[in-house]
């Protein structure tokens, strides 16, 4: 399995981190980023890992998000500047930050065996949560780790609305018979990042028919991220003087 296409939650500052304890103020969650290096030039950058001050199975590091995320994988790494790493751990998570669940009923997950090798664990099924925590169970010399959580990208709904798409007066639908159409190009106010869905509704209808049956339609055609063609149409003996429509375009980005 691959992390390609997934979001690195911690590295991209998409969450808040909190720890149970810190060895001191240069062994904190700040140092827990995967592949973190202190550059070896001074002590200000601190340890190449988060290190707990208490060494027992009650320690943890938790990532909390503003909105629910879909967690796919957790990555673990040891301390880069000492022979300290977590050899097994469990995962706990919560969707509402009130009720917590244990992944695999709290079963141990294999950790790492050296300072710098990154070990990924892909969850059996995606975990939907606001907060997720690593709880070390066993360790080499000290509880020290660097880590990352991989999630699905968060998509949000982006909507644009437009009005007054007009065929013009006495348009081409007002003459002839059979299937006829008028195409009006529409440009969005700004370009979507992904292809939107477009819905149209009539705002004004001006037409007649000797049989008292009004046959008209409107639909989008040739939709792109920049715009679409608004197609007004009629058929049979309908005479359409003019039509006007509004649109709603929505995309997940």
Swiss-Prot record:
Domain F5/8 type C, chain residue ranges per copy: 2-152
Q: Which GO terms describe its cellular component?
A: cell surface; cytoplasm; extracellular matrix; protein complex involved in cell adhesion
Chain positions found as N-acetylserine: 2
Q: Name one GO molecular function term.
A: polysaccharide binding
Stated name of the protein: Discoidin-1 subunit B/C
Assembly notes: Tetramer of four different chains (A to D).
Q: What's the name of its gene?
A: dscC-1
Q: Work out whether the entry's keyword set contains Plastid.
A: no
Tell me what organism the protein belongs to.
Dictyostelium discoideum
Record keywords:
Acetylation, Cell adhesion, Cytoplasm, Lectin
């Amino acid at each position: 399995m691959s992390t390609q296409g997934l979001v690195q939650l911690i590295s991209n500052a998409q969450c808040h981190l909190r720890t149970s304890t810190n060895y001191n103020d240069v062994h904190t969650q700040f140092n827990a980023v995967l592949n973190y290096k202190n550059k070896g030039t001074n002590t200000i950058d601190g340890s190449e890992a988060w290190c707990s001050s208490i060494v027992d199975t009650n320690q943890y590091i938790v990532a909390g998000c503003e909105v629910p995320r879909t967690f796919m994988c957790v990555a673990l790494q040891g301390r880069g500047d000492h022979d300290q790493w977590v050899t097994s751990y469990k995962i706990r998570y919560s969707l509402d930050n009130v009720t917590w669940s244990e992944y695999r009923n709290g079963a141990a997950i294999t950790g790492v065996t050296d300072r710098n090798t990154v070990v990924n664990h892909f969850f059996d099924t995606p975990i939907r949560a606001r907060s997720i925590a690593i709880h070390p169970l066993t360790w080499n010399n000290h509880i020290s780790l660097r880590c990352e959580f991989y999630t699905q990208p968060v998509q949000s709904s982006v909507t644009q609305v437009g009005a007054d798409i007009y065929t013009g007066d006495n348009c081409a639908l007002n003459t002839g018979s059979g299937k006829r159409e008028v195409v009006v190009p529409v440009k969005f106010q700004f370009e979507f990042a992904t292809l939107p869905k477009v819905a149209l509704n009539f705002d004004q209808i001006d037409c007649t028919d000797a049989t008292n049956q009004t046959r008209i339609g409107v639909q989008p055609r040739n939709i792109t991220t920049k715009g679409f063609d608004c197609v007004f149409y009629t058929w049979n003996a309908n005479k359409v003087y003019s039509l006007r429509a509004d649109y709603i375009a929505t995309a997940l980005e």
